[in-house]
Design a protein with these regions (language model features):
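Tryptophan-rich substrate-binding surfaces of secreted polymer-degrading and adhesive proteins
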Residues: 1-85
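Extracellular/virion structural assembly segments
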Residues: 1-10, 14-15, 70-91, 101-299
């Protein structure tokens, strides 16, 4: 198992325009229903206003604006996997470049693409990593190939990039009908331990289920988020360093790779973007520590 501790990254370029709405202007009079962009987020007016900066007047009973979410261009850089940056209509590729300073790993989550190319360059333009991945999953047998829909991976993590003080990551996603990407993460990868059998995984469902007095149930489908309980083995010599890493991650989102095999056949269900809920370690003997890590995913 590995953990990717994310670092702040900056979008340098993108083929996706930021044209969801006009930019907010302090001198413009806005009416109810108007939409604006402010600091890469879309706001909708809930009251007439002039000079009311959206991020400062979007909460409480006297709010003038309601936050609707990130712009399409920056949806892949918010904290949520479910909000996707989608290529412009008619485009079959989505290309962007972000800073990759002092990073050793990156991950692309909740994407829709038939192929992905990632290129990492240092500050002098030297290519340190260049790989193209076909997202088609392995097919187990001819019957599945001919009679079942082909499946594709939706998450991909790479944790073996050489570190450079100044670097960039350029990604190109290709998909007929338009690619999309839910989250891009860059940071440092830390080995935690070896994932054992009896690891548990599931989801937290945010859908509503209301049943009235007559037994009629109304279901409202909403988002869900991954959750996992990882059982790990590690050597006692690594316990202190792992404890420091986990202590640093409390209350912060990170990418947890329960299966750090970066091939197509890895268990993607054990890849969770979320926060550390709890962990405990048991020193079984002089050469073995058993550790439980509970992670709750972000939707």
């Amino acid at each position: 198992m590995k953990l990717i501790e994310p670092q702040a990254i900056r979008l340098l370029s993108s083929t996706v325009p930021e044209n969801d709405a006009p930019a907010w202007s302090a001198g413009t009079a806005y009416q109810i229903g108007d939409s604006v962009i402010h600091e890469h987020k879309v706001y909708k007016a809930v009251a007439d206003s002039t000079g009311k900066q959206p991020d400062q007047h979007s909460e409480g009973t006297d709010a003038f604006w309601r936050l609707m979410g990130p712009t399409n261009r920056y949806a892949m850089l918010d904290q949520y996997v479910s909000t996707q940056t989608v290529a412009p209509m008619g485009a079959e590729t989505l290309t962007f470049t972000v800073t990759f300073n002092r990073c050793t790993a990156f991950a692309l989550l909740n994407f829709k693409a038939t192929s992905i190319r990632a290129v990492v360059k240092d500050g002098d333009g030297l290519v340190m990593y260049d790989r193209t991945v076909n997202t088609l999953k392995d097919v187990d047998g001819y019957w599945k190939y001919y009679f079942l829909p082909l499946e594709r991976i939706v998450d991909q993590a790479v944790t073996n990039i050489p570190m450079s003080p100044v670097a960039t990551l350029e990604v190109t996603l290709t998909q007929e009908g338009g690619p999309a990407l839910g989250q891009v993460i860059a940071g440092q990868a830390w080995p935690i331990g070896t994932t054992q059998y009896n690891t548990r995984l599931g989801i937290r469902d945010y859908s509503r289920k209301d049943t009235d007095e007559f037994g009629n149930t109304r279901l409202v489908k909403r988002a869900n988020a991954k959750r996992t309980s990882l059982l790990l083995y590690l050597h006692p010599s690594r316990l202190d360093s792992v404890r420091e890493i986990l202590a640093r991650m409390h209350g912060l989102p990170a990418l947890w790779l329960g299966d750090d095999n970066e091939g197509i056949g890895s268990y993607q269900s054990l890849t969770v973007w979320g926060w550390l809920e709890d962990w405990s370690a048991t020193v079984i003997g002089p050469n073995e520590v058993s550790m439980n890590i509970d992670v709750q995913g972000l939707k």
